[in-house]
Amino acid sequence: MYNKIILLGNAQDAGRPQLGCTEKCCEDARRDTTLSRMPVSLGLHGEQFGIVETTRCIGDQITLMGNLPISEVWLTHAHLGHIEGLGQFGRESFNSKNVKLRCSDSVVDYVMKHPIWKKLIERGNLTFDKFKSDTIVPIEVPHRAQDFDTHAILFKGKNNNILFLPDHDTWEKTLDFVEYNNPKEWFSSLDANIILLDGTFWNSNELKGRIQANVPHPTVSETLDLIGEKSVNDPRVIFIHLNHTNPLHYPNSDEYQKVTSLGWEVGEEGMELNL
């Protein structure tokens, strides 16, 4: 169905600059808007057009797609940055008609508990549909499952299989859950040759004034230790979902250079990937 994916944002849920942040990372982005970044989302191109995640920047992100008619929405989970754009499908804005909403049963339940989003279903702006297809395969992963579950999504194409994994708690939990010893083994088992991978934090001491352990994500440093240097048969690994504090936002940083020197990549808004 789809033959191309566009990365519509590479930042964590709150984007960059982030509300309330007065550190250099966000002050730089306020002074120079070329440094601002939208939250992670994917544009799906083919005979029809879809979007993965509905961020607060959904209007700008659909513009980045070419302002194309959206026939379906996929959600990996329901943390605010991945779902808050749903309201834009309502009658105050787009007033869409029967756009398919594809998400897990627990996310369906979560949507229906919230009056603003429930109205979108009742008014026919959105219609729940199956959370899988012949070429799009959700894969459950551990990630703060108090209210709903979280999934990675595998997109299967003629040329590439692309795994989208913006959020998970730890490699230890995820690998235990999927029953593989290391990330590369898991990626290989999925026949995935492009990985859009959770790169939220560079290290475990990145957040100031907050307990970082309360926002669990594998750090990029840890992931690099696990996957090492890219070899000829390895998939492309592209780090996405970068927190506003992450030095990978700066291409001239030592951290960015370390990623690329090992043969891996950092996602950029507008990046196109063929399926």
PLM regions with names:
Residues M1-M65, F128-P183, S188, M271-L275:
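Core dinuclear metal-dependent hydrolase active-site scaffold
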Residues Q12, L80, V108, W202, ...:
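Residue-level marker for beta-strand->alpha-helix junctions and adjacent short loops that shape enzyme
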Residues E47-R102, N193:
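Active-site metal-binding motif and surrounding structural segment of the metallo-beta-lactamase
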Residues N67-P69, R91-K97, L120, W186-D191, ...:
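Short, conserved loop/helix-junction motifs that constitute active-site signature segments
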Residues S71, V99-V108, L196, I238-I240:
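Short internal beta-strands
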Residues D105-W117:
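A short, active-site helix/loop in glycosyltransferases that binds the activated sugar's phosphate group
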Residues E122-F128, D134-P138, S261-E265:
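Active-site regions of enzymes building and remodeling cell-envelope glycoconjugates
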Residues N161, D169-G270:
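Cap/insert and terminal regions of metallo-dependent hydrolase folds
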